[in-house]
Regions:
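Catalytic phosphate/metal-binding cores of nucleic-acid and nucleotide-processing enzymes, i.e., regions
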Residues: 1-32, 39-44, 48-55, 63
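Short, compact, well-ordered microdomains
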Residues: 49-81
Length: 81
C-alpha cells in the first residue's frame, strides 16, 4: 500500500476517488470531492467526509492533515472504507 501527501490526495479526489488517512482514529472515515450540479445549493466544489457513523459533512483539513504523508486511496483498502 503506497501512501502520499495531501497534493496527491486532492488529485485522487479530482478523479472521483475517495481517500483516507492511516492516522485517523475512526475506521471507515474517508473524504471525497463534491462537484455541485443544477440542484445543489453549493456553487463551487467542496470536500466532504463520510464519518464513522456514515454521516456526510463538509470537511476542513487540520494542520496535521495538510502535512501528513499517510494518505491512501480507499481502493487500497478494498473499496470505500
Amino acid at each position: 500500500m503506497q501512501t502520499f501527501g495531501i497534493g496527491k490526495a486532492v488529485k485522487y479526489m479530482e478523479n472521483g476517488e475517495t481517500v483516507t488517512r492511516l492516522g485517523w482514529n475512526g475506521p471507515g472515515q474517508f473524504i471525497q470531492l463534491q462537484v455541485p450540479n443544477d440542484l445543489s445549493k453549493m456553487t463551487l466544489p467542496y470536500i466532504y467526509i463520510t464519518t464513522v457513523q456514515g454521516d456526510l459533512v463538509p470537511w476542513l483539513a487540520s494542520q496535521t492533515d495538510i502535512l501528513a504523508t499517510d494518505w491512501i486511496d480507499t481502493e487500497s483498502l478494498g473499496g470505500e472504507s
